[in-house]
């Protein structure tokens, strides 16, 4: 929008979608492995991913962090145009620049995140990033209440959006790693689908709420409400996601015969192996 009008922008986006679809069709994908589940009912197949997700402590923590991220992203996506066009009286190009600040922060974080994750555990990175979202939203709520509309406010908004973009990317990007380590290969499609569905529930909560508050109350109220939701998600994630989160967990199977294939393959060298929820591990070890 800084160089072309929105008609050409949407046309270019449509061409991009078509090109993406053609590229997807050109790729040969490996045949997916069949699920090992003994229960083949429609209900079991439909809910398997969500059941695995909600029984895995680190993924319950991920869902809480996703709620915090949704609170921040909803404020940006829904209210940027309202703030820039209505409150500040600026142009479509200025809206694009404001959104670009958020996008630049997200991309910058994505570039440096792999090196960070090589040194710092996912949990610490994601929860710290969620805490930055809380601080950023709270600071913008306070600034919105004391700084009048004008260029100063816009410059502050650009910086705030960049910070939110960085923190959003760092809180959400590692989710694929968590999902991959939390399921067997045959259950990963269902688990990724569960993440898609549950994350959209978070957005379904925050998007309408932030729009109603921004339009019906004030932007300060919208910022404050999203900060409160992000704080709730961050604290919930801290509670649900154990600080000690090893891949391999010691456990036994008193219900299985001694010659069971799982015992021979996974427990031959000891009582621990990478632990995920499946038909042989229906509850998390140590769950109260």
Annotate each predicted stretch with a short phrase.
Residues 240-288:
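Intrinsic disorder in cytosolic terminal tails and internal cytosolic loops
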Residues 30-64:
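Juxtamembrane intracellular "pre-TM" segments in multi-pass secondary transporters
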Residues 5, 10-17, 47, 54, ...:
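C-terminal transmembrane bundle of multi-pass solute transporters/carriers
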Residues 55-75, 162:
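Pair of pore-lining "gating" transmembrane helices in MFS-fold secondary transporters
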Residues 1-39:
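Cytosol/matrix-facing ends of alpha-helical transmembrane segments
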Residues 25-26, 72, 180:
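A structural signal for long alpha-helical coiled-coils and helix-turn connectors
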Residues 42, 73, 105:
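Charged, low-complexity surface patches
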């Amino acid at each position: 929008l800084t160089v072309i009008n929105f008609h050409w922008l949407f046309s270019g986006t449509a061409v991009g979608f078509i090109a993406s679809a053609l590229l997807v069709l050109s790729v040969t994908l490996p045949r997916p492995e069949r699920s090992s589940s003994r229960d083949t009912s429609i209900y079991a197949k439909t809910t398997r991913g969500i059941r695995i997700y909600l029984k895995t402590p680190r993924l319950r923590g991920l869902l809480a962090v996703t709620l915090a991220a949704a609170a921040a992203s909803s404020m940006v996506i829904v209210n940027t145009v309202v703030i820039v066009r209505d409150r500040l009286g600026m142009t479509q190009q200025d809206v694009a620049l404001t959104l670009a600040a958020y996008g630049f922060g997200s991309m910058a974080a994505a570039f440096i995140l792999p090196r960070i994750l090589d040194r710092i555990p996912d949990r610490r990175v994601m929860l710290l990033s969620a805490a930055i979202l809380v601080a950023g939203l709270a600071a913008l709520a306070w600034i919105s209440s004391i700084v009048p509309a004008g260029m100063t406010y816009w410059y502050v908004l650009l910086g705030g959006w960049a910070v939110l973009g960085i923190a959003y990317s760092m809180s959400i990007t590692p989710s694929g790693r968590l999902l991959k380590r939390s399921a067997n290969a045959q259950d990963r499609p269902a688990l990724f689908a569960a993440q898609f569905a549950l994350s959209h529930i978070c957005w379904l909560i925050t998007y309408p709420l932030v729009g109603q508050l921004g339009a019906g109350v004030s932007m300060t109220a919208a910022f404050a409400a999203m900060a409160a939701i992000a704080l709730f998600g961050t604290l919930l994630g801290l509670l649900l996601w154990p600080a000690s989160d090893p891949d391999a967990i010691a456990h036994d199977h008193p219900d299985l015969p001694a010659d069971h294939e799982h015992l021979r393959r996974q427990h031959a060298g000891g009582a621990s192996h990478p632990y995920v929820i499946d038909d042989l591990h229906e509850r998390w070890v140590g769950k109260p």
